[in-house]
Amino acid sequence: MADSNVAGRAAPIRPLYTRVLLKLGGEMFGGGQVGLDPDVVAQVARQIAEVVRSGAQVAVVIGGGNFFRGAQLQQRGMERTRSDYMGMLGTVMNSLALQDFLQKEGIDTRVQTAITMGQVAEPYIPLRAVRHLEKGRVVIFGAGMGLPYFSTDTTAAQRALEIGAEVVLMAKAVDGVFTDDPRTNPDAELITAISHREVIDRGLKVADATAFSLCMDNGMPILVFNLLTSGNIARAVAGEKIGTLVTT
């Protein structure tokens, strides 16, 4: 991961948000490969630990794209529901890995899954998740919604609403939402603030349609930012002006 110069921050961060839902793409956990990159997971865990120590409550949803992507497996002839369940299992592997590295950072962490896996995780119980957060624990939601055809973006939006998070922090491998694809258009400009409605009107991509509709209909802000810059999770929680903030 690229390191930013954060040595100049003299005081600990002061969180703007009390409770956040952090959405992490599974592809980043693999470092661009199939499987897990321990260095990436460790770096993410350090960033989350910094935020928790500042007093913020953090819940996490992780994708499983570094292991399986149901839609892609379907294109190769696999039955969609079965391939989606395989993807859900991938999210659990990522969740357990992040839990391990957070525990090594001294952060008490619970994994809750939408599919019962009693030996490795708690079942998803919203009130229990909130109680864990109030006690300063990180809660990682694994196995997506537990239903095929629903993405982990949708899971992030739904879980954020149900646990009373103030914002969905959508961590990406880019700096935010641009006017065009910056990989193909060097003149593409970063959009720092935009409304939910304008995102739709301009055809911009923030999250999948179901997830975005949930956030728009319920007034849930989304902050899209670059996870690959060290310290950005803390900056996002502190309300520093990074990435793209989508509000009603």
UniProtKB/Swiss-Prot annotation:
Alphabetical GO biological process terms: 'de novo' CTP biosynthetic process; UDP biosynthetic process
Molecular function GO labels: ATP binding; UMP kinase activity
CDD domains: AAK_UMPK-PyrH-Ec
Binding-site list for UMP: G64, D84, M145, G146, L147, P148, Y149, F150, S151, T152
Function: Catalyzes the reversible phosphorylation of UMP to UDP.
Keyword set, alphabetical order: ATP-binding, Cytoplasm, Kinase, Nucleotide-binding, Pyrimidine biosynthesis, Transferase
GO CC, alphabetical: cytoplasm
Summary of activators and inhibitors of this protein: Inhibited by UTP.
Name assigned to this protein: Uridylate kinase
Lineage: superkingdom: Bacteria
Family as reported in the entry's similarity comment: Belongs to the UMP kinase family.
Biological or metabolic pathway of the protein: Pyrimidine metabolism; CTP biosynthesis via de novo pathway; UDP from UMP (UMPK route): step 1/1
Binding annotation for ATP: K23, L24, G25, G26, G65, R69, F178, D181
InterPro entries per UniProt: AceGlu_kinase-like_sf (IPR036393), Asp/Glu/Uridylate_kinase (IPR001048), Uridylate_kinase (IPR011817), Uridylate_kinase_bac (IPR015963)
Oligomeric form and interacting partners: Homohexamer.
RNA-binding keyword on record: no
EC nos: 2.7.4.22
Catalysed conversion reaction: UMP + ATP = UDP + ADP
Compartments, as annotated in UniProt: Cytoplasm
HAMAP family: PyrH_B
A Pfam family the protein falls into: AA_kinase
